């Protein structure tokens, strides 16, 4: 029996000014991140806390779901995943199935248990919020390394962890103007992502606060 890995996620929405770009070997950094060893199959129990700050007020809401992932080394698909919501009770059992093709293409379907209906997610819908989580459908699929252009944007520390900072701009259609990605230079794992809705506005930030070794694989446990 596979014991699910418990993951806690905190997303903070706010605005920030972005500046500065330097072009070095950003693509090599992303290759190290994407080529890091991953388990062939995994089950994660994820608790998501969404924090919004507006007009001096802080609002919080929570979501919980199970995520099943399966990696493929050959065939028509590179990865398949299923997200199934546990909390809140009003959306219990709601699911999102994602299939990633070997060519980087993706197909998604969501399931509404109360209506017993499954529906395919259209390309134009991938920028929409998924079940009011602050995730959009695009966040729950994999983008290929050629789908974005990367440049090195500096070096910073996240806590005690030295990181190389990348800035990515989409080549393939994306709901985001760009992303700022903080990569741990020791583990080659992502520590933080800032999602830009425009050149000067960050719409949300994902923090990966704890990464531990499980069975020889580096996995985030607190986000």
Go through the PLM ranges and name each one:
Residues 66-73, 151-157, 209-211:
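Short amphipathic beta-strand and strand-loop transition segments with alternating hydrophobic
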Residues 11-20:
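Hydrophobic h-region of N-terminal signal peptides that target proteins for export
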Residues 24-28, 62, 140-152, 200-205:
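A short, amphipathic edge element
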Residues 48, 85-87, 110-112, 122-125, ...:
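Short, structured patches in soluble enzyme cores that scaffold and shape functional sites
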Residues 97, 107-111, 117-119, 128-130, ...:
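Gly/Pro-enriched, hydrophobic low-complexity segments
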Residues 21-114:
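N-terminal mature ectodomain segment of secretory-pathway/periplasmic proteins
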Residues 91, 102-103, 148, 174-176, ...:
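Short solvent-exposed loop/turn micro-motifs enriched in small/polar/acidic residues
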Residues 2-11:
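Sec-dependent signal peptide recognition
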